UniProtKB/Swiss-Prot annotation:
Superkingdom, taxonomy of origin: Bacteria
UniProt xrefs under InterPro entries: DUF480 (IPR007432), WH-like_DNA-bd_sf (IPR036388), WH_DNA-bd_sf (IPR036390)
Protein name: UPF0502 protein Bcep18194_B0081
One Pfam family linked to the record: DUF480
Biological source species: Burkholderia lata (strain ATCC 17760 / DSM 23089 / LMG 22485 / NCIMB 9086 / R18194 / 383)
PANTHER family the UniProt entry points to: UPF0502 PROTEIN YCEH
Family: Belongs to the UPF0502 family.
Membrane-traversing stretches: none
Upper classification of the organism: Bacteria, Pseudomonadati, Pseudomonadota, Betaproteobacteria, Burkholderiales
Length: 235
């Protein structure tokens, strides 16, 4: 499914930290969504890492933390620092280092920024980076990424009640699929204590309301001389 000619040879990489992965995702995203301000300054890059929307998990990192992570990414050649501006600016080098086409980069970027996604979610959320014709084309590129000698993504076990499998990036290391399946199953079958207490309170409120309405009906029936029990037997 690789449609990009002369794709560079991929390099083996160490596992990234969560912040390093976030930085890579932000740089690719902003290259497409705000091209006029790309490459990004340290301030803009930090803001992108701490962005509240289209991020999972939401982070709160400092410029010093981003600078440290950038040093690691520059050592891996995943990020380059420009020298033509008084303000240091940073750009990604994902296509050359990983040796994957732009379509695959778009999907990987969404996984880096938003966490596990279904193929349908990836198609929707990657629209500003690349427009996929259909879900099958998304799955084809995901399959390629998963089949590499050093896989970049993995298909997760389907959660109970879910219609589709989700995909997860492996840039931060391998995941234990059995643990992931157990976590999904536990999340589907159990109710958090706070939610359970809220349900109990709502049940009591409804029971009290039914009792109040029942008493009101009996009182009104008595005032009108209606025998409620007789009416019930007749029905």
């Amino acid at each position: 499914m690789n449609t990009t000619p002369d794709t560079p040879t991929p390099r083996a990489l160490r596992e990234l930290t969560p912040l390093e992965a976030r930085i890579v995702g932000v740089l690719v995203e902003k290259q497409h969504t705000v091209p006029d301000t790309y490459p990004l300054s340290l301030n803009a890059l930090t803001a992108g890492c701490n962005q509240k929307t289209a991020r999972a998990p939401v982070m709160s990192v400092s410029e010093d933390e981003v600078t440290t992570a950038l040093d690691g990414l520059k050592h891996l050649s995943l990020v380059m620092e420009g020298s033509s501006s008084r303000v240091p600016r940073f750009e990604h080098n994902v296509n050359r280092v990983l040796g994957i086409p732009s379509q695959a980069i778009a999907l990987l970027t969404i996984l880096l920024l938003r966490g596990p996604q279904t193929a349908a979610e990836l198609r929707l959320n990657s629209a500003r980076l690349h427009g996929f014709a259909d879900i099958s084309s998304v799955e084809a590129f995901l399959d390629e990424l998963a089949a590499r000698a050093q896989p970049l993504v993995v298909r997760l076990p389907r959660a109970p009640g879910a219609r589709e499998n989700r995909w997860m990036h492996l840039m931060c290391g391998e995941v234990n699929l059995a643990d992931f399946a157990s976590a999904d199953a536990g999340g589907a079958d159990s109710v958090p204590p706070s939610e359970f207490e809220a349900l109990k309170a709502e049940q009591k409120r409804l029971a009290d309301e039914v009792a109040r309405l029942n008493a009101l009906v009996l009182r009104m029936a008595s005032e009108l001389g209606i025998d409620v029990d007789a009416q019930g037997d007749a029905s």
